[in-house]
């Protein structure tokens, strides 16, 4: 389906520069776009590509359009303060237009407990299981092999992709998106040590602590593939509104993730940790348990957080990649820091003694 720039601006805003009747059918990168495609400039370092792009129109920020000067003549633009966000909204619209909603109903192979409540407008795919007391909201879509445990509530307009498992006693707010393989509500990692003795004479066991809380997920949350969110030990694990979680993230029991926070892939967050609003957690970050991150905290990739970070800011503890030889030299220096410290102390002591002797003379 083709849409004019005028139609896009009427829906999403922005100022048209050029021909508002220009029609676009899809989006594409600046260096690949054709005359029926819409491109966007989010990073000024690619400004030169705007001069050569074949795109029918470009989403651009006001300042970048000014930098183009005469090169903008004869081209079509939608000028907006945030071209990247504008692009995202247009892309979602094109997807919605290309893939109309599936027909409501329950697939014959699905297993729905008679005590469950499934909205008539919901879409229940093949081999889905919905246990007793579960509630599936209006227009929710559960794809093949989804499991929804007893008493769990799935909000309106949510989409659970194939092979998602939502354990008992959990809540997903409206418009939640949960990707394949994600598990929400599995037991938190809670074991009480009950050992006596020392060494080889030590006897006893780890005693499992029942995890009787749930997981509460707010509205407009997206959870990536193969991500796991543990249920609380006594109170709920809470994921606040508009949180976006990447693939392969582990969130321990009793954590609370503040609204609008984003968490990149392979991050691990130990139990009872609180992360504030509008935080950004980089890939492979490890966060210890029982710590608190304040609002607007950014932790860069592969950093380890072992204590609370209450103040907004950017935090890094990862060692950036360097050439192999440089790393070996740095590692050798680190291994010998204690010897270097002892030598410096000895030199300082000798220097102090010499200065003392000179003063006495």
UniProtKB/Swiss-Prot annotation:
Classification via Gene3D superfamilies: 1.20.5.170, Hexapeptide repeat proteins, MurE/MurF, N-terminal domain
Transmembrane regions listed in the UniProt entry: none
UniProt enzyme class: transferase
Pathway info: Bacterial outer membrane biogenesis; LPS lipid A biosynthesis
Entry EC no(s): 2.3.1.191
Pfam families: Hexapep, Hexapep_2, LpxD
UniProt protein name: UDP-3-O-acylglucosamine N-acyltransferase
Native organism: Burkholderia pseudomallei (strain 1710b)
Source taxonomy: Bacteria, Pseudomonadati, Pseudomonadota, Betaproteobacteria, Burkholderiales
């Amino acid at each position: 389906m083709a849409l004019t720039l005028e139609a896009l601006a009427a829906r999403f805003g922005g100022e048209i520069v050029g021909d508002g009747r220009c029609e676009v059918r899809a989006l594409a990168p600046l260096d690949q776009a054709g005359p029926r495609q819409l491109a966007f400039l989010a990073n000024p370092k690619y400004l030169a590509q705007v001069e050569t792009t074949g795109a029918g129109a470009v989403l651009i920020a006001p300042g970048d359009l000014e930098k183009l000067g005469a090169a903008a003549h004869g081209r079509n633009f939608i000028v907006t303060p945030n071209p990247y966000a504008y692009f995202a909204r247009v892309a979602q619209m094109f997807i919605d237009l290309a893939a109309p909603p599936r027909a409501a109903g329950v697939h014959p192979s699905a297993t729905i407990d008679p005590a469950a409540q499934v909205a008539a407008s919901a879409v229940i795919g093949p081999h889905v299981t919905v246990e007793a007391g579960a509630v599936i909201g209006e227009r929710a879509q559960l794809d093949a092999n989804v499991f929804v445990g007893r008493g769990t509530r799935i909000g309106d307009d949510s989409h659970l992709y194939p092979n998602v498992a939502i354990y008992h006693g959990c809540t997903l707010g409206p418009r939640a998106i949960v990707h394949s393989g994600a598990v929400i509500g599995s037991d938190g990692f809670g074991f009480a040590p009950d050992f006596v003795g020392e060494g080889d004479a030590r006897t006893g066991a780890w005693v499992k602590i029942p995890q009787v809380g749930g997981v509460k997920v707010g509205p407009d949350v997206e959870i990536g593939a193969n991500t796991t969110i543990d249920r609380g030990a006594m109170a709920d694990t809470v994921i606040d509104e508009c949180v976006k979680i990447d693939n392969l993230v582990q969130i321990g029991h009793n954590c609370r993730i503040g609204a609008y926070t984003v968490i990149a892939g392979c991050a691990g967050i130990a139990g009872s940790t609180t992360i504030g609003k509008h935080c950004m957690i980089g890939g492979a970050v490890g966060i210890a348990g029982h710590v608190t991150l304040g609002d607007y905290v950014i932790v860069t990739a592969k950093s380890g957080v072992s204590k609370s970070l209450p103040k907004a800011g950017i935090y890094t503890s990862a060692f950036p990649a360097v050439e192999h030889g440089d790393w070996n030299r740095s590692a050798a220096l680190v291994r010998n820091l204690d010897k270097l410290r002892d030598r410096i102390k000895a030199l300082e002591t000798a220097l102090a003694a010499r200065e003392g002797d000179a003063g006495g003379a």
